[in-house]
Each structure stands twice: as structure tokens, then as C-alpha cells.
Amino acid sequence: MGDAIDLSGDGGVLKKIVRSAKPDAISPSDDLPVVDVHYEGILAEDEKVFDTTREDNLVFSFELGTGSVIRSWDIALKTMKVGEVAKITCKPEYAYGRAGSPPDIPPDATLIFEVELVACRPRKGASVGSVSEERARLEDLKKQREIAAAAKEDDKKKREEAKAAAAARIQAKLDAKKGPGKGKGKGKAK
């Protein structure tokens, strides 16, 4: 899609966007450090695939900045958006270095990863936003529920009062119709 971007400043981590994300897509952040990715890892020297999540269609999840993945991934994933697919070229010092990762990755290997950022989310048990913001939101919801309950109770009371008033009016009309001299044998003069 474009030229490779030098993310490390020394040519050690190059990123080339294969598919752009939607403009409003989210990116990993301090609030959303856990990422889910699909990837395919290739040895640059012989283009042999050494690892992929595509075969079993399971995403690989990890938290950025914890050292749980190679340095190039921490650097590159922070620049991606959900839905983006990028080709990341990693020099050995940003991958597995002199040690490699036997048996699949030899020492001093340059690696190429095609990575799709599938999702980013908060740490388990954490929420986006601060605890005080969450408390304030819950307090506001509680107040809204109390106001709604009071309004409902008020409406119920008004309906009961209206029913009682209507019953009193009907009773008054019935009593008026039964006035003196209109009933059977009551007070009729002969």
C-alpha cells in the first residue's frame, strides 16, 4: 500500500501497511493494552513459514509492554489500528537475536510477520476510565432510578386519588337521584 515505515529509527523494525483500518478504528493504549492478533511468521532468508495462527483460526493474545513478545511486536502493534494488516520486518536485535528460537528460528534471523490487529481491550479486571469515573456513573444511575421510582409512586398516588374522586362523584350522583320522594313508599303524601 505504501513504503515501509522505519518504526525503530535504525531500520530494525519496518512496517508496511497491507490493509488499512477504518478511520475511526481504535488503537492499543494504556487503557487498552491487551491485543488479539492473527499472524504469519516467515524467515526472511528462505521465506519459510515458521508459525501462524491462520491454520487453526485462533487469535494470539498478549499485553503490550510486558516483555511477553519480541521487541519488534511491542513497537509495531502500538502503531496499528484494529482491522489493520501490516507486514513487519524485524532485524535479529528486535526479534530473537543471536540465540534464535530453536528449532524453527536460527540465530541472527531476520523475520517477517504479516500481522492483523483483531482487537484491543483493557486488562482483565480493569475497566476503561478511572474508578472514580465509574463510581460517579453508578451514583448517577442510582439517582436516576430513585427519581424514576419517586415519579412512578407519585403517578400511582395520583391515579388512586383520581379513582377515589371519580367514585365519590358517582356516589354523589347516585345519592342525588335517590333524593326525597323518589324511592318506593318513602314519604309520599296521599
Swiss-Prot record:
Keywords for this entry?
Acetylation, Isomerase, Rotamase
Instruction: Report the top EC class in one word.
Output: isomerase
The enzyme's E.C. designation:
5.2.1.8
The modified positions for N-acetylglycine read 2
Task: Pinpoint the PPIase FKBP-type domain residues.
Answer: 32-121
Compositional bias segments (type: Basic and acidic residues)? 149-163
The domain of life is Eukaryota
Q: Where is the composition biased (Basic residues)?
A: 179-190
One GO MF term on file is: peptidyl-prolyl cis-trans isomerase activity
What is this protein's record name?
Peptidyl-prolyl cis-trans isomerase FKBP20-1
Q: What is the lineage of its organism?
A: Eukaryota, Viridiplantae, Streptophyta, Embryophyta, Tracheophyta
Give me the gene this protein comes from: FKBP20-1
